[in-house]
Amino acid sequence: MFALRIMMTSAALWLALPAVFVPAQALVDGPWIDMEPARYRMIAAEVDGQAYAALEVELKPGWHTYWRYPGASGLEPEFDFTESRGVAAGKPLFPAPYFFDDGVGGFNGYEGRGGFVFPLRFELNGELNMRGMIGVCREVCVPMEVAQKLVFNRDGLAASPHRGAIKTLLQAQPQEPSDDLVIRSASFDGVSLQLVVSGTALETVSVITIPGPHDILGLPRIVGRDEDAFLLEIPAWSKLDHPLIGRKLTFIVRAGARAIEQNIQVRDHSLLPQEPLTRQ
């Protein structure tokens, strides 16, 4: 009778506990899924105390995929985690993109092997269900559907063999501007945006601009330089009631393996002191 009473009490306590999803088996990576001309898989790990998942993508030579702002041509990646249980995924963290000139305006994206990282929030256990679409492009752009499930707990993420891969993707994000690489000034002369980019050991630089919904921007070109700075011009136009001067724009600046993301206010070019850069 005493044993029965203990069993009944234990059962009552169990029923009173909040429902917690318990994974049957920890799974911190999925199998590689081949879908010509790319393959992909999901991985997960804990990095510096934060849980992350990542979509790893490998593209065949000559193929590309896209950044969150794909540019004049391309498809913006889309991801959905609403079918997940016990875990919530944050907005994707993108590596710094490259610009590819396809002859029709160009696009911003990646080639080879890379991926997209998602910060995770969960208590003890989680089942992460990812569905999405990424564009892959060569001569034509093709939407490629991706889907995979991971099941894990905190101990599994802490012991995951994918910590290094996710850390590498996190480090590939655009960094904060610093003396090593920074937009020194941004101005508009009525025809073009003028950017002065400075830094250390600069051989060349490239710029990607994130325009507003009423902006039309051309391709940047280097028009001047000195020992530690480049002057770039970007043909620009915006609606009269959305002037560029006084507004903040976002730029990605790349110098080799280094990349920064910087928000900077556009000033009236006629009011700025002229930079002593040699025009090309």
Name each model-derived stretch:
Residues A24-Q280:
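Extracellular/lumen-exposed scaffold segments
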Residues M7-V20:
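Bacterial N-terminal signal peptides
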Residues M1-L4:
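N-terminal secretory signal peptides that target proteins for export/translocation
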